[in-house]
């Protein structure tokens, strides 16, 4: 049996990985079992209860900076807050703020269904799950969910601009950015942009 001497080197994700059948499979082959992708487990995790005792919070500006720092700490690279028009809040619940997190994505998760292609999705789900849970612990409503207007909310929250296709283009990452699940909350926050009807 051969003994490995020295560190294991993997040619990924360097440019030399193009054409590597294992790398291509890692990115592009749909998973055989959804339980092999952490994203499905996080999506199915039940939301915790809202703390019945509301925390004594700071001003909306300070609270917003704390929430953003938490999101950065748990893996988000871009974080912004958009105010959502109350009459457009959807199911009648007034959750006037949308916290939008985004992460760099070398490969678009919508086009790369393999385990590797879903890394930005998994990381984004983890970040939004933790932030929403923390807000509920503060005694406020918060829910993280897929939103068909996520990229529009991201632009309204100052994370970038929308291109002609309606996709987010971030200053730092260009189009190589994944917008995570959107957190809707009634925690008093300071929006980074104008109110958005959705």
Regions flagged by a language model, labelled:
Residues 77-198:
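Catalytic cores of enzyme domains
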Residues 1-83, 90-95:
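Iron-sulfur (Fe-S) cluster-binding modules
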């Amino acid at each position: 049996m051969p003994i490995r001497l020295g560190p294991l080197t993997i040619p990924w994700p360097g440019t030399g990985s193009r054409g590597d059948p294992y790398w291509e499979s890692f990115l592009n082959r749909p998973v055989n079992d959804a339980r092999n992708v952490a994203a499905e487990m996080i999506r199915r995790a039940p939301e915790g209860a809202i703390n019945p005792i509301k925390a004594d919070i700071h001003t909306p500006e300070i609270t917003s900076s704390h929430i953003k720092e938490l999101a950065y700490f748990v893996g988000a690279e871009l974080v912004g807050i958009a105010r959502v028009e109350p009459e457009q809040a959807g199911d009648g619940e007034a959750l006037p703020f949308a916290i939008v997190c985004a992460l760099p994505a070398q490969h678009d998760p919508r086009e790369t269904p393999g385990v590797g292609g879903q890394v930005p999705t998994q990381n984004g789900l983890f970040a939004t799950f933790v932030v929403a849970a923390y807000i509920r612990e503060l005694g406020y409503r918060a829910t993280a969910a897929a939103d068909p207007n996520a990229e529009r909310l991201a632009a309204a929250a100052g994370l970038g601009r929308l291109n002609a296709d309606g996709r987010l283009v971030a200053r730092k990452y260009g189009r190589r950015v994944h917008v995570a699940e959107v957190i809707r909350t009634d925690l008093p926050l300071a929006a980074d942009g104008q109110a958005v009807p959705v």
